[in-house]
Amino acid sequence: PIALFLMAALTELFVGKRRGAGLEPAVRVLIYGGAGGAVIAAIFGWIHTGLWFGGDTAMQLHRWNGMLIAVLGVVLAALAHRRPESRTMLRIALASMAVLILAQGFLGGELAHGQNHLGISWL
């Protein structure tokens, strides 16, 4: 889902720059795929850890951020499905998704490689 949502955001930038290029269906398909993948990833995340709510802060943030990504993915799919005159809400949601995905990647790195895995002490 990560790559699909980020590619949807990038493609939406091209839609904004080149009106009439016919890229809107591509954005829609990328969002649908990302939403489906995000829901599946969230389900498997819960299967992996069960209803165990322990773990450190990074683990809990990763879990709940993943849930937020799945929910926002479904909202994005609904926004992409309807054809509004303005794409402002879709663009805001895609930008929000990009921020959430960047945070999720960082948290995943924390879980896999430990604290300060990027070697940047101020994070």
What are these regions (language model features)?
Residues P1-L123:
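Polytopic transmembrane helical bundles with strong interfacial aromatic enrichment
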